[in-house]
Amino acid sequence: MNILLLDGGKAFGHSHGELNHTLHKKAKEVLTALGHNVKETVIDAGYDVEAEIEKFLWMDAVIWQMPSWWMHEPWTVKKYIDEVLTNGHGKLYHSDGRHSVNPTEGYGTGGLLQGKKHMLSLTWNAPIEAFTREGDFFEGKGVDVLYMHFHKLNEFLGLTRLPTFLCNDVVKSPQVEQYLADYQAHLEKVFG
């Protein structure tokens, strides 16, 4: 399988981006050992928009590695999305999917990457209970509800969702070795 790894880690403020870079490297190591072909982009290091479009055409699956900043992706990841996906019109998506015969139906079905998949690998300082416990901050709804927009932007291209990987408590109670072991197990289960 051809897998594109997108590293959205960024040094900014009190965040140094190191955990996301470390998880990105672990994914490359594990997926290569499993026999997959891997291409990668460290978003904050810069990228060529046309080369990134070609990577999306090449890949069978993309893994978005990123921290949560203020309940969503860092601005550098959003900029990458705006530049790469918008310029991918005609290659990554044809249209929004609607037709003049019935313009109220079919929105989001114009993607050209059907059969390909996406996965999120996220780092949060929030404890897992903030996502899973009723009455807690995220009302027991889980992390994927917060990332519906992100899943939908991938779906707009035609990609289907793979199970999300989540590291919790990354500042207050970091467990880096456990995160790496859990991520390896997750990758082996999903891509093994």
UniProtKB/Swiss-Prot annotation:
UniProt keyword Cytoplasm present: yes
Catalysis: reaction(s): a quinone + NADPH + H(+) = a quinol + NADP(+)
Pfam families named in the record: Flavodoxin_2 (PF02525)
UniProt EC number: 1.6.5.10
UniProt KW keywords: Cytoplasm, FAD, Flavoprotein, Oxidoreductase
GO CC term, one of those recorded: cytoplasm
Disulfide bonds: none
Keyword NAD belongs to the record: no
Family matches, as InterPro entries: Flavodoxin_fold, Flavoprotein-like_sf, NADPH-QR_MdaB
Oligomer and partners: Homodimer.
UniProt name for this protein: NADPH:quinone oxidoreductase MdaB
Organism: Haemophilus influenzae (strain ATCC 51907 / DSM 11121 / KW20 / Rd)
Gene: mdaB
